[in-house]
A protein has these predicted regions:
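Conserved catalytic cores of soluble enzyme domains
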Residues: 1-91
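Terminal amphipathic helices with adjacent charged low-complexity linkers/tails
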Residues: 71-121
Length: 121
């Protein structure tokens, strides 16, 4: 798996790597992810801050990143937690646990999330 942490401004190819990771984390109020930064965007007549252009709220809403935390330490902790769910090697299986979730449980939201008529929204 690929894990990426946005610990500051991430632009261009680095932004693509962050967005294509299996799990990605940004630091709120510190990180920004964009193809081109504010100076480049200003050349086409739009003056935007780093946060307006690619702050954590925009990236979470668009699905470009998976998580946002308050500090760099929390970002590393989140990455460690994600990796803790995986085996140490491709030659090992993940630990199995007995789920306490009712296997017959239904979720109305999931049932309604995909319309029965795929031509309607």
């Amino acid at each position: 798996p690929r894990v990426a942490l946005g610990l500051g401004s991430v632009a261009g190819l680095g932004a693509a790597h962050l967005a294509c990771s299996h799990y990605s984390v940004m630091v709120k109020e510190k990180s920004a992810v964009f193809v081109a930064g504010p100076p480049v965007v200003e050349q086409i007549g739009q003056k935007l801050s780093k946060n307006e252009l690619g702050g954590y709220e925009i990236q979470l809403k668009s699905g470009a990143v998976d998580d946002a935390v308050d500090t760099e330490e929390e970002a590393f902790d989140a990455a460690k937690k994600f990796l803790s769910y995986l085996p140490n090697s491709v030659y090992q299986l993940s630990d199995q646990i007995i789920s306490k979730d009712d296997p017959k449980r239904t979720s109305e939201w999931l049932i309604e999330a995909i319309p029965k008529n795929i031509k309607s929204v």
